[in-house]
Amino acid sequence: AAKVTKAYIGIENNKPDAIKLMQEKATAYQGIEIVPLKVKYPQGGEKQLIDAVIRRQVPAPPAIPINVGAVVQNVGTAYAVYEAVQKNKPLFERIVTVTGKSVKNPSNFLTRMGTPMSQLIEMAGGMPEDTGKVIGGGPMMGKALSNTEVPICKGSSGVLLMNDKEASRAEAQPCIRCAKC
């Protein structure tokens, strides 16, 4: 229906082993290209990825990526679509990352929807004593959680456990748009 002839998989260039492995695997499929990406923020946003991978800019709204011939999917969504189309499997589980500097066993877990985040934290070695904040999602767009009994849902991607030092708020300073953050 979409008449797709080319697919790109973007991987940050600080992951050379992943890039090499994916390039080897991609040779078995016509029209798939692995694109090493600069490690920078923001890079994972839809518009930024389109610009970095195919050098097209999505105009201001109401324009959307399809207007420049692009569709962007994250790995979890792409995998869910594959399983639905190829295996007739409904979406009832996700891969969820549990990570953080103090986590004993940072891991990716294939997790059923509804599983409490607390169970994943236990599977990764338990709640570190120095935990200052628990974030559902990632460090930039995730949400701080006051309760780890929150269930995994289709939008869950990770649990980030920040230690006390990381969780402390830096003194507010005026933004001069230096891009250091």
Give the residues covered by each predicted segment:
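Short polybasic amphipathic segments
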Residues: R94-V98, G132-V134, S157-V159
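Short acidic beta-strand-loop surface patches of small beta-rich interaction domains
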Residues: E12, S102, G132-V150
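Cysteine-centered iron-sulfur cluster-binding motifs in ferredoxin-type domains/subunits
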Residues: R169-C181
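N-terminal and secondary-structure boundary signal
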Residues: A1-K3
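A structural-propensity feature for long, helix-poor, extended segments
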Residues: K143-E171
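Hydrophobic alpha-helical positions that pack around
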Residues: Y8-M117, M123-P128
